[in-house]
């Protein structure tokens, strides 16, 4: 099908600013030269309403004035006229194409430029029309307001669309080509040379190809050309086919087009279309042909012209109906049908695309709305989630509370039902048993009342709150209560088979087949309605609900509504929800409404009942009026009855109070009597124990006459020397027999004695019998031990005869010959006492004061046994680890014949050592492998199973205070050893309290000194209370105590037995807190509430006690040094610089070359020119000739210090004439004028002042004045200098007088330069960066000037000194002192690095400042010092101080290894240059001899005064020839003062017990406390707080309360007091010098390794093959009481009691 393509609404040369969009065909090629014609989407109104930018005039509305569509120019009036503006472009330019034009020519001006990029053929023949055109959307055609063109139908030319022609015009009217240039004849009048049309393209590949122009337009005056016959015939043959191939297309305008084109516009369009038709022939719209050039067309001849004219005339005269081809109407209808089909298909496709676009838009819109909804939900959740959660939680909590209340209420009601049931049964049983009818009726009424209560309670349990009488009304029973409304009944249905409760399973009713089918049909109908987007017909549920409710009411039970098929949307879930709603209503709402109605009904009935009662009262009022007198009588009787009742009640109350008071007094008197009886019983029990012990002591004392001889030198013996006289103090004494009683006396156990009897005769007899039995047991035990030894056969049996104690008095023991040393007199007496004890089988305590030779006395006993009795062992010596070497050395030294086996080391070593003695039947002789085994307490406990297998002849415990706790495993293990005798060596038998002495006595005599609480309390309570309260001690009790101790303990003090030993002077030095210490102390005190501490201390909680001890430790730290809390650190400003990174030091050699590479962050780049000589203004040279002006003229010609000028001035007696009197030449003056201040000072430093020596030669002022040289006349300062005189006076008073200014200058610290401020940041000088090497050289010379640095603070090194000697150079210039004084810190030097000042370190502590002054004096006096500390951290600080003062020292604490301790002590003893020995009080106070020192300083005191005594006795002992001075540093007004007072109280206890003296000389008016923790808490308070606490305590005592004590506080405190003491907690982790640990602690001396190895139990562990192993020990910070007890095993009872 052929036809013209649809026209475009715009001409290409009439392009608007915003061209109309028309999508190009997909197959159309792209042409680069058509870029200006490319179309884009429209953004403005249609382009036909815009004016073309290519024309300067409006388009003409006349169709005749339009230019030809083929692009040719309109007819010209003259051939010489230039081409018109409508002239088509040449073929070489833009090609010409056919224009689609849907708009009429009256609106758009035509132009031949085509928007397509196809070239046009160069011939003039019209080309064939394309079969098709690229399809565009039908909607694009609606953009035009004129759907029909005036030149054709649907945009096609009228020449190709056949219209019904009009009637034929008259024949005389013949149109010519001039008249009708667009006629068919005019078209056929073309050139003679025509080319065949190009082959037709397929519809898929066809492109719009325009027709070539037929001929050049001619004017109407020129004759038409004549065509040939052939040409005419050819045109005739082709015309029908052309017209026949064109269909007719008619299309009605759409609604949108009608809206755009009004009817009048359509009418105008139709008229315009009709006017273009003439003579029944449709006028062609335009000829789309491209004319060739004018010269290419041939000129017809005259003959050809005539023939053409003739043919044209024939054609004009002929009938034109013959041009219509047959079948044209059919083709037109087919074409229109196809057009309609295509339009419909396009419209459907557009609808589908529009639907897809709508769906896509709706999807995007839904996603956007979904996002908005999600965001809104998140915002709402974020804003309200917390409140909702809180609300839900609150609701749950409230529901839980209500549930608990309901459960409690239910339980109470169930209990009520159960009790009422019991009452009912009891009442029914009593009624059944009652004989009297009235009594039976009474019981029945009680049963009925109980039944009613049970019923009411059960109804309450079931949740029924309505009154009983309402619920009992049934439809069948009449309502007898009355009322204004009738009653109705809602009955209950039969109980359902399902379980009760909301959570039980619910059985749905079965449905019929019809119901199921109806539900299925309804579901299918609903699904189909949903698919068709139709509304669902949902039927309401009201009617079924009403019907079901009616059925429920009628039926009397609740039925579940069944789903009905009325709803089109009835599903299973819907029905379930619907039924669940109704079930909830039936379960919850209906009972609630019922209860409300029932309650309202009961309220109404109650009101009606009250109304009836009032009415009845009103009706009976007339009767009361007549009985008024009776009513008054009744009122008087009631009043009388009330008065009588009140009287009797008051009387009964008074009697009850009196009865209670009498009972209370009786109970109190009974308690008092019982207390008195118990006191008497305890007194008798105590008296029995003391009497028994006194008898034993008496028996032993009469045998041991040697102890009596010690009375001259032993104050304890003097105190206990008098015997007990009969008849004096009969309440506390018994008669001493002259001999031992009958051996057959019955022995009574302590538990079987009757202490309630008033007669004490039986108790005295029992005490005597028990004492005799104890003596006999000791004798039998010694005999039994000796019976197994062959060496004991030679003993005299009579000496062991306890029936004849007088024979012991004749024994006189001399010093053994085996002993190489010479015993002193008191030591020989001690040996005599020890031997007597051994021969009697009695254990003892040698308690000589420290330093009197307890060790040598013990060794002499072993030598005596070996020499006299041939007993060579085995002997067991147990001592602290620090004294093991001392024991081994002294035994080997004094008794070489006795072999010593040192038992210590690792487990493997000890296993090898046990081979020497681990035999059951070994015989010890002089040739045995060993005689004495020396070991430590820790190893004894570890290897207790092996020690228990051996029968030891003698066991000596050195420093026996290690077993002062009878509850420790160490005490129990040692007590279980098989040994004949035990000897305890201790210099301080009483350290903290009398309980420790009692533990020692209990150890040596377990059967006699049994662990009775009464005896131990008497031992400690009375004496300690005497020391605290300064009261008078019972002399009789003290005397009895001394008698008890006399046979078992021997103690001598130094001042009585050793006259040659120097005195010991103790001085307390009080120090004040510094500002920093006071701030720390106040801050600690403000943060602690003393009242809370005291209240907690009264309770006695272990955690509170630990907290209290921690506080005490913090306060003591403040007193010692504040740096124990926080050390001063090295500070430096922030350095803003680049630091060079060094290479790996591993790859370097021994010396690493570290150059100065620090650079500033700021660098100034400088050109090479400025750095060189040419860029300097003041440097003259070839590059800078003008720079020498300043040097030439200003520095030389104009300088007054030139030699020429000065010489002229001197000659003329000018300004420089003074140079001749100051010893200065012209050259020197010139040189000085050109030097700076620093250079002049450096040069003057090396000059020798010769003029000052004249003061030495001429000491007279007159001679000195006459000795002035003329050339030094003006050198007044140099001549008066006394430096040479000072050098002559090397020492003495003269030198001091001559150097007063210098000494003052140094003493005041004026020679010390300190920075005033420390910068926050520092940086090196800004460096200059240049390609020249001159800046680096100048920087190096400026920063590192050797001469300047040497002059300021440099000292000659060793290499310089060697070079001076080798080269023999004058050393004066190199040995001058630096110009700058010594910096404060040698490490920090003159930098901004602040190193902590040692002066500040010393002055920050008041103690350290006092110690600094004291050490200076002692150093000057030639003394040597033992410095004791409680904290090892303080020892660390003291090491820094001693290093700062250059004092030589050595250190020994718990971290020192055992093998190093011996060497350290030896160094101090042998090297006098060691000035100070730093020791820990607990570790360095035992077993070492430090007599080289004569001064002892306690930096901080110990809780236990005996610990300090042991420490100071390291120097004050045998071998000390000088006076020992003890200094104790105490901080005034702090806790240390109170600790010292408490230590003095403990010392008084020891003095009273041991010496027996009265309490005098010391003020003991201190606070008496039951709780030691409470006493320590008082130490933390100051005087004002202590006074306030005392006042509150006094008020509490007046009220009969215990101040600060809670419930069970006293019992808890007593219970914990037995477990651990406060002093143990304070010294937790410390050892007693016997540590073998090498790990230093942080706060105090640590626990020894041996103790930490294991935790031995009280019973010996069984043997485990190769040994027990070493295991891990407990930490020094163990928390439990059991671990602490194991940690301090044997150290219990060190608390500040």
UniProtKB/Swiss-Prot annotation:
Low complexity composition-biased segments: 202-221
EC id: 3.6.4.-
Subcellular location: Nucleus
Catalyses which reaction(s): ATP + H2O = ADP + phosphate + H(+)
Keywords: Activator, ATP-binding, Coiled coil, DNA damage, DNA repair, DNA-binding, Hydrolase, Nucleotide-binding, Nucleus, Transcription, Transcription regulation
Domain named Helicase C-terminal: residues: 1410-1570
Domain DBINO as annotated: residue spans: 581-706
Keyword Coiled coil: yes
Keyword Ion transport: no
Region called Disordered, residue ranges: 1-324, 398-569, 615-637, 1626-1697
One Gene Ontology term, aspect cellular component: chromosome, centromeric region
Class of the enzyme per the UniProt entry, highest EC level: hydrolase
Top-level taxon in the UniProt lineage: Eukaryota
Predominant cellular place of this UniProt entry's protein: nucleus
UniProt free text on domains: The DBINO region is involved in binding to DNA.
Subunit-level organization: Component of the INO80 chromatin-remodeling complex.
Function: ATPase component of the INO80 complex which remodels chromatin by shifting nucleosomes and is involved in DNA repair.
UniProt-recorded name of the protein: Chromatin-remodeling ATPase INO80
Organism: Aspergillus niger (strain ATCC MYA-4892 / CBS 513.88 / FGSC A1513)
């Amino acid at each position: 099908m052929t036809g013209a393509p649809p026209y475009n609404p715009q001409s290409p040369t009439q392009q608007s600013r915003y061209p109309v969009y028309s999508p190009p065909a997909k197959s159309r090629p792209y042409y680069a030269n058509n870029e200006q014609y490319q179309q884009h989407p429209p953004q403005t109104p249609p382009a036909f309403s815009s004016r073309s930018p290519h024309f300067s005039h409006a388009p003409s509305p006349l169709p005749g004035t339009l230019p030809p569509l083929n692009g040719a120019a309109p007819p010209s009036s003259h051939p010489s006229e230039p081409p018109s503006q409508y002239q088509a472009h040449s073929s070489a330019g833009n090609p010409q194409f056919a224009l689609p034009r849907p708009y009429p020519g009256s609106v758009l001006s035509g132009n031949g430029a085509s928007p397509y990029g196809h070239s046009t053929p160069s011939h003039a023949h019209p080309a064939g029309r394309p079969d098709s055109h690229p399809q565009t959307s039908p909607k694009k055609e609606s953009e035009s307001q004129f759907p029909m063109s005036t030149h054709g139908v649907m945009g096609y030319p009228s020449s190709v669309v056949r219209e019904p022609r009009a009637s034929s015009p008259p024949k005389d009217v013949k149109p010519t080509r001039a008249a009708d240039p667009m006629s068919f004849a005019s078209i056929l009048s073309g050139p003679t040379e025509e080319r065949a049309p190009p082959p037709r393209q397929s519809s898929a590949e066809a492109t719009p190809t325009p027709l070539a122009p037929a001929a050049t337009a001619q004017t109407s005056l020129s004759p038409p050309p004549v065509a040939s016959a052939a040409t005419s015939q050819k045109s005739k043959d082709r015309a029908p086919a052309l017209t026949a191939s064109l269909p007719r297309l008619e299309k009605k305008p759409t609604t949108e087009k009608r809206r755009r084109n009004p009817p009048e516009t359509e009418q105008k369009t139709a008229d315009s279309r009709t006017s273009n038709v003439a003579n029944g022939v449709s006028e062609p719209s335009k000829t789309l042909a491209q004319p060739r050039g004018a010269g290419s067309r041939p000129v017809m001849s005259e003959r050809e012209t005539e023939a053409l004219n003739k043919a044209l005339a024939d054609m004009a005269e002929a009938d034109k109906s013959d041009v219509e081809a047959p079948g044209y109407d059919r083709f037109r209808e087919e074409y229109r049908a196809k057009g309609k089909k295509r339009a419909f298909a396009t419209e459907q496709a557009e609808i589908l695309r529009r639907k897809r676009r709508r769906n896509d838009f709706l999807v995007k819109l839904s996603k956007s709305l979904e996002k908005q909804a999600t965001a809104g939900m998140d915002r709402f959740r974020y804003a309200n989630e917390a409140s909702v959660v809180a609300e839900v939680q609150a609701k749950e909590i409230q529901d839980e509370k209500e549930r608990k209340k309901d459960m409690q209420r239910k339980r109470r009601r169930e209990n009520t039902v159960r009790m009422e049931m019991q009452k009912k049964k009891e009442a029914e049983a009593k009624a059944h048993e009652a004989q009297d009818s009235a009594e039976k009726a009474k019981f029945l009424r009680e049963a009925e009342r109980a039944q009613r209560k049970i019923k009411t309670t059960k109804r309450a349990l079931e949740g029924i709150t309505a009154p009983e009488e309402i619920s009992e009304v049934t439809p069948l029973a009449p309502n007898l209560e009355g009322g204004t409304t009738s009653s109705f009944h809602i009955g209950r249905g039969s109980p359902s088979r399902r379980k009760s409760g909301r959570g039980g399973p619910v059985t749905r009713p079965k449905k019929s087949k019809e119901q199921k089918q109806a539900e299925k049909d309804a579901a299918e109908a609903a699904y189909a309605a949903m698919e068709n987007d139709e509304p669902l017909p949902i039927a309401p549920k009201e009617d079924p609900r009403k019907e079901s409710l009616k059925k429920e009411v009628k039926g009397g039970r609740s039925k579940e509504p069944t789903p009905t098929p009325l709803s089109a949307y009835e599903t299973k879930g819907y029905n379930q929800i619907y039924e669940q709603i109704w079930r909830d209503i039936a379960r919850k709402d209906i009972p609630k409404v019922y209860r409300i109605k029932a309650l309202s009904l009961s309220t109404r009935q109650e009101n009606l009942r009250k109304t009836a009662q009032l009415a009845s009262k009103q009706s009976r009022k007339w009767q009361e009026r007549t009985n008024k007198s009776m009513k008054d009588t009744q009122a008087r009787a009631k009043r009388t009855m009330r008065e009588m009742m009140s009287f009797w009640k008051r009387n009964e109350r008074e009697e009850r109070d009196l009865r209670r008071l009498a009972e209370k007094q009786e109970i109190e008197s009974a308690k008092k009597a019982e207390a008195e009886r118990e006191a008497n019983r305890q007194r008798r029990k105590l008296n029995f124990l003391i009497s028994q012990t006194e008898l034993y002591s008496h028996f032993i004392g009469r045998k041991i006459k040697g102890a009596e001889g010690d009375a001259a030198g032993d104050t304890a013996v003097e105190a206990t020397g008098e015997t007990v006289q009969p008849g004096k103090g009969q309440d506390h004494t018994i008669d001493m027999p002259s001999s031992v009683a009958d051996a057959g006396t019955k022995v009574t156990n302590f538990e079987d004695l009757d202490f309630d009897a008033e007669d004490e005769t039986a108790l005295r007899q029992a005490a005597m019998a028990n004492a005799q039995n104890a003596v006999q047991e000791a004798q039998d035990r010694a005999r039994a031990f000796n019976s197994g030894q062959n060496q004991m056969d030679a003993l005299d049996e009579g000496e062991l005869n306890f029936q004849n104690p007088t024979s012991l008095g004749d024994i006189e023991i001399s010093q053994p010959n085996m002993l190489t040393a010479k015993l002193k007199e008191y030591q020989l007496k001690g040996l005599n006492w020890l031997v007597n004890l051994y021969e009697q089988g009695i254990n003892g305590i040698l308690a000589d004061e420290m330093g009197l030779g307890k060790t040598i006395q013990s060794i002499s006993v072993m030598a005596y046994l070996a020499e006299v009795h041939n007993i060579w062992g085995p002997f067991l010596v147990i001592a602290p680890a620090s004294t093991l070497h001392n024991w081994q050395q002294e035994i080997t030294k004094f008794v070489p014949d006795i072999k010593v086996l040192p038992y210590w080391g690792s487990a493997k070593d000890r296993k090898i050592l046990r081979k020497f003695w681990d035999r059951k039947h070994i015989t010890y002789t002089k040739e045995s492998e060993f005689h004495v085994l020396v070991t430590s307490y820790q190893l004894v406990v570890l290897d207790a199973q092996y020690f228990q297998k051996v029968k030891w002849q003698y066991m000596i415990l050195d420093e026996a205070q290690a077993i002062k706790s009878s509850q420790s495993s160490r005490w129990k293990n040692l007590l279980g050893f098989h040994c004949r005798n035990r000897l305890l060596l201790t210099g301080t038998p009483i350290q903290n309290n009398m309980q420790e002495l009692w533990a020692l006595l209990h150890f040596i005599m377990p059967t006699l000194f049994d662990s009775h609480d009464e005896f131990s309390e008497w031992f400690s309570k009375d004496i300690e209370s005497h020391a605290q309260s300064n009261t008078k001690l019972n002399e009789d009790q003290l005397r009895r105590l001394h008698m008890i101790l006399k046979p078992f303990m021997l103690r001598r003090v130094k001042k009585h037995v050793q006259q040659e030993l120097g005195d010991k002077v103790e001085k307390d030095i009080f120090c004040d807190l510094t500002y920093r210490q006071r701030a720390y102390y106040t801050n600690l005190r403000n943060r602690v509430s003393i009242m809370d501490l005291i209240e907690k201390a009264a309770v006695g909680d272990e955690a509170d006690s630990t907290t209290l001890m921690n506080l005490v430790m913090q306060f003591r730290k403040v007193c010692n040094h504040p740096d124990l809390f926080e050390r001063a650190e090295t500070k430096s400003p922030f350095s803003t610089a680049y630091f060079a990174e060094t290479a790996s030091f591993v790859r370097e050699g021994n010396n690493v070359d570290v150059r100065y590479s620090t650079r500033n962050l700021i660098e100034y780049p400088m050109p090479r020119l400025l750095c060189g000589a040419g860029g300097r203004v003041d440097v003259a040279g070839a590059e800078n000739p003008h720079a020498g002006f300043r040097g030439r003229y200003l520095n030389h010609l104009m300088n007054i210090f030139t030699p020429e000028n000065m010489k002229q001035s001197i000659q003329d007696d000018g300004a420089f004439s003074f140079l001749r009197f100051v010893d200065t030449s012209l050259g020197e003056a010139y040189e000085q004028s050109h030097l700076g201040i620093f250079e002049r000072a450096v040069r003057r430093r090396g000059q020798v002042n010769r003029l000052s020596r004249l003061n030495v030669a001429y000491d007279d002022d007159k001679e000195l004045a006459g000795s002035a040289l003329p050339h030094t006349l003006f050198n007044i300062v140099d001549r008066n200098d006394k430096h040479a005189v000072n050098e002559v006076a090397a020492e003495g008073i003269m030198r001091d007088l001559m150097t007063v200014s210098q000494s003052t200058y140094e003493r005041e610290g004026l020679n010390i330069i300190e920075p005033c401020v420390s910068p926050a940041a520092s940086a090196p000088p800004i460096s200059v960066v240049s390609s020249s090497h001159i800046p680096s050289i100048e920087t190096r010379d400026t920063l590192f000037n050797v001469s300047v640095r040497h002059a300021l603070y440099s000292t000659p090194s060793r290499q310089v000194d060697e070079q001076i000697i080798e080269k023999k150079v004058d050393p004066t210039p190199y040995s001058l002192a630096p110009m700058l004084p010594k910096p404060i810190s040698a490490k920090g030097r003159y930098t901004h690095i602040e190193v902590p000042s040692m002066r500040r370190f010393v002055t920050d502590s008041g103690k350290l400042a006092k110690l600094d002054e004291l050490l200076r004096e002692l150093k000057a006096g030639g003394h040597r010092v033992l410095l004791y500390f409680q904290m090892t951290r303080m020892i660390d600080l003291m090491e820094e101080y001693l290093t700062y003062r250059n004092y030589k020292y050595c250190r020994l604490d718990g971290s020192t290894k055992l093998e190093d301790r011996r060497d350290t002590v030896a160094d101090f003893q042998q090297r006098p240059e060691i000035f100070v020995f730093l020791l820990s009080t607990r570790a360095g106070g035992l077993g070492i001899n430090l007599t080289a020192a004569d001064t002892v300083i306690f930096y901080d005191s110990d809780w236990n005064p005996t610990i300090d005594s042991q420490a100071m006795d390291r120097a004050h002992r045998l071998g000390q020839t000088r006076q020992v001075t003890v200094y104790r540093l105490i901080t005034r007004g702090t806790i240390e003062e109170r600790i010292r007072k408490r230590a003095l109280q403990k010392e008084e206890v020891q003095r009273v017990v041991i010496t027996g003296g009265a309490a005098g000389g010391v003020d003991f008016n201190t606070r008496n406390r039951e709780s030691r923790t409470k006493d320590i808490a008082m130490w933390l308070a100051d005087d004002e707080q202590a006074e306030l606490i005392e006042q509150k305590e006094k008020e509490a005592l007046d009220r009969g309360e215990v101040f600060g004590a809670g419930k069970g506080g006293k019992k808890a405190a007593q219970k914990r007091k037995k477990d651990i003491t406060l002093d143990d907690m304070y010294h937790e982790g410390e050892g007693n010098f016997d540590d073998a640990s090498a790990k230093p602690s942080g706060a105090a001396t640590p626990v020894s390794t041996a103790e930490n190895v294991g935790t031995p139990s009280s019973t010996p562990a069984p043997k485990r093959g190769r040994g027990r192993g070493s295991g891990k020990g407990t930490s020094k910070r163990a928390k439990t009481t059991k671990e602490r007890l194991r940690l301090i095993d044997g150290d219990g009872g060190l608390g500040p009691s």
